[in-house]
Amino acid sequence: MSFMDQIPGGGNYPKLPVECLPNFPIQPSLTFRGRNDSHKLKNFISEIMLNMSMISWPNDASRIVYCRRHLLNPAAQWANDFVQEQGILEITFDTFIQGLYQHFYKPPDINKIFNAITQLSEAKLGIERLNQRFRKIWDRMPPDFMTEKAAIMTYTRLLTKETYNIVRMHKPETLKDAMEEAYQTTALTERFFPGFELDADGDTIIGATTHLQEEYDSDYDSEDNLTQNRYVHTVRTRRSYNKPMSNHRNRRNNNASREECIKNRLCFYCKKEGHRLNECRARKAVLTDLELESKDQQTLFIKTLPIVHYIAIPEMDNTAEKTIKIQNTKVKTLFDSGSPTSFIRRDIVELLKYEIYETPPLRFRGFVATKSAVTSEAVTIDLKINDLQITLAAYILDNMDYQLLIGNPILRRYPKILHTVLNTRESPDSLKPKTYRSETVNNVRTYSAGNRGNPRNIKLSFAPTILEATDPKSAGNRGNPRNTKLSLAPTILEATDPKSAGNRGDSRTKTLSLATTTPAAIDPLTTLDNPGSTQSTFAQFPIPEEASILEEDGKYSNVVSTIQSVEPNATDHSNKDTFCTLPVWLQQKYREIIRNDLPPRPADINNIPVKHDIEIKPGARLPRLQPYHVTEKNEQEINKIVQKLLDNKFIVPSKSPCSSPVVLVPKKDGTFRLCVDYRTLNKATISDPFPLPRIDNLLSRIGNAQIFTTLDLHSGYHQIPMEPKDRYKTAFVTPSGKYEYTVMPFGLVNAPSTFARYMADTFRDLRFVNVYLDDILIFSESPEEHWKHLDTVLERLKNENLIVKKKKCKFASEETEFLGYSIGIQKIAPLQHKCAAIRDFPTPKTVKQAQRFLGMINYYRRFIPNCSKIAQPIQLFICDKSQWTEKQDKAIEKLKAALCNSPVLVPFNNKANYRLTTDASKDGIGAVLEEVDNKNKLVGVVGYFSKSLESAQKNYPAGELELLGIIKALHHFRYMLHGKHFTLRTDHISLLSLQNKNEPARRVQRWLDDLATYDFTLEYLAGPKNVVADAISRAIYTITPETSRPIDTESWKSYYKSDPLCSAVLIHMKELTQHNVTPEDMSAFRSYQKKLELSETFRKNYSLEDEMIYYQDRLVVPIKQQNAVMRLYHDHTLFGGHFGVTVTLAKISPIYYWPKLQHSIIQYIRTCVQCQLIKSHRPRLHGLLQPLPIAEGRWLDISMDFVTGLPPTSNNLNMILVVVDRFSKRAHFIATRKTLDATQLIDLLFRYIFSYHGFPRTITSDRDVRMTADKYQELTKRLGIKSTMSSANHPQTDGQSERTIQTLNRLLRAYVSTNIQNWHVYLPQIEFVYNSTPTRTLGKSPFEIDLGYLPNTPAIKSDDEVNARSFTAVELAKHLKALTIQTKEQLEHAQIEMETNNNQRRKPLLLNIGDHVLVHRDAYFKKGAYMKVQQIYVGPFRVVKKINDNAYELDLNSHKKKHRVINVQFLKSLYTVQTRTQRINQSAPLRELREHTKLLHS
């Protein structure tokens, strides 16, 4: 078989020479099927061209054959046909590729591309993933569709505001430049935020802790005997400052060097002539934007962090001074290893003409300074000391004794500097170790950790000592340090502490060994932002007031400070070695497994019984991914980490078919962590869930422990081997190679389960150990017991070859940290620095920020009484049920205050006595578990519990609600109380007899069964005594209805002077000589004065009667009383009703006036909270409007309907009968019951309607069973009343009643929302408000249309204003006749206008008798099962009668109670061809019953 015959779908090619048949293997990943995917087509062509460019081809035919071998059907079939038609020896390779492209290329959908781009953002994805996805999507864009500038604009809109500002400042010319600038900016921010300082090289900003890492990488920091504690400041500043600081010189000199700018007199920033850097407008504009953007960001604060002093020169002085030359200028320089950074004086900067660049404000204070200073400018300096070339960055100061100060970062990076400077300054004798005479210092103050403000008298005796130190630079490797001997003093302190002797006056002498606790070095900075919250980390170490130490040469060295204050309970970063406090036999026995470094993978690691395996789901694909794009700098970091892993034998080079990419994640200390992206592998892995222990359960086991040890395994995952057969699955790729793990890596989905199971199996039988992954807590009640416990645990770790990280452990202490808690003797408390983080958490602005805050709070919720109740407003905001208001702000403050007030809980002790107190209310349930002694006195609180109620639970009776609270509390504390006797206290006495109840409800019976599993004594606690649980569960909210007193117009006179209009009118009338108009109203006052002088019409409108100002017979309302008037006519329970703008304006405008009256009402109603709560959007009506005939007179045509869904009253009233006169719109609201039948309905009509208004001609209603009853129909016939009923499912026929019911429902919500059980009491008031309110159609109230006058209202306290009118009989008849004519005209006009407006966009449906139609399923049938998949229309049915243009009677089954008249909105014409029409006529139409059954039972 020839080569061409082996090609799938081929075999018909002409015979080729041997040189045309290449022997290159097919790459499976490089294939194309031809699925009209333009992106894949482009990638395929690019890849195939790239591969072919590396091979020498004899002719185009061989290239075509090679390309054809990578095509799959249908692309392969196309290639066969194309080559067969053209001839393989006749066509060129370019023609083949062009034909492939033209055949399978499909123009991309621009809208889809843009939609995909709008889904991206830096905030969601991060800058690396954003760049990757944006480039992938953008490559699908047609080449000439958008310019490069438009591409940059599209990309930058996806960045965060901070990144966008920096990228804009760089002014990128290409999309690639913009993406690179954004990546570099964000990488710097993520790496060094929140702390940073100037790098010693002066080109970048680095984290303050970056300097520490260089020293922590070596072994000498673990030798605490030689460690001196130094402190360096970090400045945490606004995020916006972190971005623009990267490499100032390089960034500003992209096109021109510094020398070229100086030579050509160019600006260092914009590279233009005519100005200097400090005059550059472009630079000022950018800095101004950044400054404004950062004003609302986080404020500056200074925080102390410990570092380790460079111990290779421990015998040298801390400072040295020397004059050095910079640019041939002598500069007086101070070398100070105690300074956290470098400084330079401003006059030297100006003399040397250094370029100044902006920095975040640095706040500092020296040794003896009483005030702090701030600087925000820095320069980069190049200098040479002997043969050492140094580049450093220094802050600029206006006043300083020295011209240049070189600080600790440079001296640590270049340790030879101090050697060089000191050797030229002092004789060799001066470099000898200084010794101290044995002296005594009196009157020394000591601050203990627990009581900083209590001084103690201590005598100090000093004597020299010799200590052994480890010099890391002299060690050949990490495991073979070289010992050197250094002289240090002092070492022994004899302390006399009168306080420890009690009040007897005798003293006890304490000896403190400084071999294990070295005094902190002098710190040049003082904590400024929170000085009162710090305390000593070294208990009982002396701080002399004016102490001095006598040196050999007779000089005194002033001691300024010997203790550095740090945050209380903060993590001890000084690596204080507590391992040496253990007994010597323990230290010697376990020194091999307690270390700071992780030794290489032992050869016998495979002997460990636990191995991690990876089981793949059937049919799942393993990852085969390319490495991510990384910068050159990040690639170097990756290579360093990979090399270290190779040296430790944790990874080996791999030839695995799998590959996962890697990413670098910055740590807090400035270093990086290598993370493998195993997401694809994890999706294909069968999960192996293993439950982690509950933290509450772990803490409950501590009991009466007095001494604690915490252990932290050193890279615990890397101490578990991989199953050899599964190692290839862990393969990862870097830009330089592929590797696979021999140990369990981080990031695998089942890695936590494997490790947790391993640790649980190792320590399952030990009750004095708590294990949570690699965190181990050992607790004991005495030191002797603790040594045994510690020996047991360490022995097991040693047997399992598990290494413990020494500097992360804390041995044999009375207080320690474990899983975010501070644990001590009879104490469990939250960590203070965690509480400080919560306290400093900014007010959330988004849902995610609120969720993040609640997540932090929920971890410590056991310390917060009433936590769920306090957090409820925040939860409502997260659920989008509330806006962020003052309630949420108060909840935030309450939660912060509750957590930051040092809450302390006592650990659970199985031998102690406990008392559970519960309470419940309609708002929630709460409980508190307390420990009590034998006399029932409180020892401490073990924990709090609170929970909100669900809507159904709020309806439980009081007894069941209390029982529910008990059950929930017992379930919460079950792990402590189950199987133990305790006291259960409740303030609901009915619970005491629940267990004796004969036949309780099923729910209660189930709860009682749960109670039976506990051993408790039920105790009644009177409500006033149940303070704690009551506070947790109860919160009282009262809402009072809006009321207002009658308006006293006489009081308005006192406001005339301050009102601009009234004062202008009175001054013009010479009734007032001076005014009190406020400055903000002066412009309006002058405008009114001008109008009064120039316009006679304007003047005539105003008059003065009884010292009251009138505008056209309407009272003028001062500004300060306008809200009172609007409140009366809008909010009042009797005169208001919370109507809209039109109605409220109609109420106010006939009586009162002020400028912009309508605008004021609009604004008032728009901001009315009650209106926003109760009013709903009124949807547009559908279908043609066929109005009813206009009513001829009062109460001749009425409509009626029922309002249901009301809560039953004390009289069992639960429905309202609404009767409306269609002429005057007057209504009666009659309270009744749902059980009302036709006979009772007739009785109500006689008692409330017919007896007052006579018998109507027509009654319009819906098809309620009461109206369709035989008795009702017989009555209306005998009385000559025509009963008009709406068609099925079309309540719009009785539109008058429906509209009235809408208004009635809104009034009910406004009046009775706080007292829903008594709605019938408010019904007469609501009826009066409704009938006295003018309607929009008629312009008058129903009262006036019906009676001819307005009823008197007591809203106005004035004898002159009377609303009710007095008529004679003749006048009343004339007035009523005029009203009747006017009302008819207005009704006709409104009807025509309404019909025109509603029918503009409607199309009538005209049917003839005999036509066939389809009926919508909602017209007759109730919703059944699976309605989403049922047909929308049923039928066809035949039209048998036309009622009007809007309703037709259909040929439906007559046995149904519902009417066969259907509104046209539920009908649809059936369009058929002739043959189908004949078939329909020949057979009977589908019947209603069959369709009903099909819908309900399908």
UniProtKB/Swiss-Prot annotation:
Q: Where is this site: Cleavage?
A: G207, A208, H233, T234, H309, Y310, N442, N443, S561, T562, Y1037, T1038, S1063, A1064
**Could you tell me which InterPro entries the record lists for this protein?**
DNA/RNA_pol_sf (IPR043502), Integrase_cat-core (IPR001584), Integrase_H2C2 (IPR041588), Peptidase_A2B (IPR024650), Peptidase_aspartic_dom_sf (IPR021109), Retrovirus_Pol_polyprotein (IPR050951), Rev_trsase/Diguanyl_cyclase (IPR043128), RNaseH-like_sf (IPR012337)
Q: Recorded E.C. number(s)? A: 3.4.23.-, 2.7.7.49, 2.7.7.7, 3.1.26.4
Zn-finger (CCHC-type) intervals are: 265-282
| Ranges of residues in domain Reverse transcriptase | 646-823
- Among the record's GO biological process terms, what is one? DNA recombination
**What the protein does?**
Capsid protein (CA) is the structural component of the virus-like particle (VLP), forming the shell that encapsulates the genomic RNA-nucleocapsid complex. Nucleocapsid protein p11 (NC) forms the nucleocore that coats the retro-elements dimeric RNA. Binds these RNAs through its zinc fingers. Promotes primer tRNA(i)-Met annealing to the multipartite primer-binding site (PBS), dimerization of Ty3 RNA and initiation of reverse transcription.
Q: How does it assemble?
A: The protease is a homodimer, whose active site consists of two apposed aspartic acid residues.
What is this protein's name? Transposon Ty3-I Gag-Pol polyprotein
Organism placement in taxonomy: Eukaryota, Fungi, Dikarya, Ascomycota, Saccharomycotina
